[in-house]
């Protein structure tokens, strides 16, 4: 995946989580999907592991959702964020705060946002 800044939906999600839990926001999105986004580091790690990266391509696509509220519900209840949210507070009220922040950033009604991933092809050295 690309950095958090290259994923509009998840950047809005993280902003909502930071608003809901300013002292201790869940860090799953920052540390797991977006925590290994530097292709220079990934390629170096591949070389250390005995692979040679023969192609590195960053792909940006546009995601679509019926609403920011639907995105908030899906992320909060249907990802590894859920137990982290429930350990800090109420799932329903947190989802509402996250939805408000996501709507402020993405708009109301149907939403779209960019998302970037890195595709790396590697072969044994």
Regions found by a protein language model. Name each.
Residues 1-25, 39, 68, 72:
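Conserved class I S-adenosyl-L-methionine
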Residues 30-125:
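Conserved Class I S-adenosyl-L-methionine
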């Amino acid at each position: 995946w690309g950095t958090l800044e290259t994923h509009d939906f998840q950047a809005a999600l993280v902003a909502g989580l930071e608003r809901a839990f300013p002292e201790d926001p869940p860090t799953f999105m920052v540390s797991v999907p977006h925590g290994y986004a530097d292709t220079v580091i990934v390629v170096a790690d591949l070389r250390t592991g005995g692979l040679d990266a023969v192609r590195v391509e960053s792909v940006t696509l546009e995601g679509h959702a019926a609403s920011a509220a639907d995105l908030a519900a899906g992320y909060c209840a249907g990802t590894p964020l859920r137990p982290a949210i429930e350990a800090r507070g109420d799932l329903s009220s947190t989802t509402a705060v996250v939805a408000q922040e996501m709507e402020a950033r993405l708009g109301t009604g149907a939403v779209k946002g960019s998302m970037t991933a890195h595709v790396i092809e590697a072969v044994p050295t």
